[in-house]
Amino acid sequence: MSEVSVKAKLAKEAAAEMIMKTTAEKDEALSLIANGLRKELDFLLAENAKDIVNGKENGLTPDIIDRLSLDEKRIRDIADAVELLIDLADPIGDSLETIEKENGLFIEKIRVPLGVVGMIYEARPNVTVDAATLCLKTGNAVVLRGSSSAIHSNKALVSVIYRALEQSALPIHAVQLIEDTSRETAKELFTLNDGLDVLIPRGGKKLIDLVVRESTVPVLETGAGNCHIFIDETAKPQMAEKVVVNAKTQRPSVCNAIESLLIHKAWARQHGKELLDQLENAGVEIRGDELVCELHPSSKQASKEDWETEFLAPVLSVKTVENVQEAVKHIQQYGTNHSEAILTENDKNAVYFQTAVDAAAVYHNASTRFTDGFEFGYGAEIGISTQKLHARGPMGLPALTSTKYIIKGTGQIRE
């Protein structure tokens, strides 16, 4: 049997045990994992350093190196995030609906684990811990398949998790890492219907599209983030500058950073140069339409490809529009249903924008950077879903559950 088949089988066996574990047992394991991450700080940093060296030698871009990198603060933040899960309510067993029939049947709809979650992701070591601990909290087993660029980091993190599980009441095989990062293992996961209950891709558009296109396992899609902000004619200049600069520059390599800026032409003529200067001073390369290049001569001419691109880097495409309707039309054509925002003092335009734009999160006068499990109060997230079935937006604990009907009777039969 292949590594994928063997580890999926172990995970499935563990999932059958996990469903019987109590909240206290799961929380104890999470506490052990958090403590283990802090104790093994030097080991984790040393293993991550190997990935960074290899990444630079292999020509990985700075934004990928940033996502790949762990430092003491990031590891402590990851450990803190695990402990936050302990404080969150365990959704397993929650009663969602009850029905009492005239014949005396009592029907209750409750939350149950999904079973075995497959996770395929790119150069983000934090996802290894996020996915593992979210799955453990919700009574699931998980099969992790990261990228070759993060293999040393992922193996180190999972070794810490294993040691914690050995000390806990949870089955050690509930977390599995596929160490073979070849394309063949990914393709095997795509068709492992008897081993996985769901497959979650987390990464760039190419990875997500590949999984959605080729997987026969049900996919919980986490979409790419070609996010926009539209500055309407009545937007306050200071607020617009603050929000746009934050949404683009705070962390350009994440999926809720903006990639395109749409500006009402009247606002652009009056305030556009100052905003574009601020962005340029913050290290952002501007690729704009004709009016943008006229207002800000150091900008590059934008192409159709720029409107379509999730840069994940300090690059921003900027387009001027006549009105909110044109802004919405542009987003409908190029957006990825992730996070979109309007900055305006016109409530009618805000309502129109938030109603017409089809996205998981639509903001009025706020940065798109808030689309995040922690910011929404869910704790850590397994990803941000841009699809409409099962879950949409930041996916916290409830997104990793399914439902079951529990029916109690006293001998009723159907006539």
UniProtKB/Swiss-Prot annotation:
One of its GO terms (molecular function) is glutamate-5-semialdehyde dehydrogenase activity. One of its GO terms (biological process) is L-proline biosynthetic process. Belongs to the gamma-glutamyl phosphate reductase family. SUPFAM superfamilies: ALDH-like. The keyword Mitochondrion does not apply. This is Gamma-glutamyl phosphate reductase. Pfam families: Aldedh. The lineage of its organism: Bacteria, Bacillati, Bacillota, Bacilli, Bacillales. One of its GO terms (cellular component) is cytoplasm. Catalyzes the NADPH-dependent reduction of L-glutamate 5-phosphate into L-glutamate 5-semialdehyde and phosphate. The product spontaneously undergoes cyclization to form 1-pyrroline-5-carboxylate. It comes from Bacillus subtilis (strain 168).
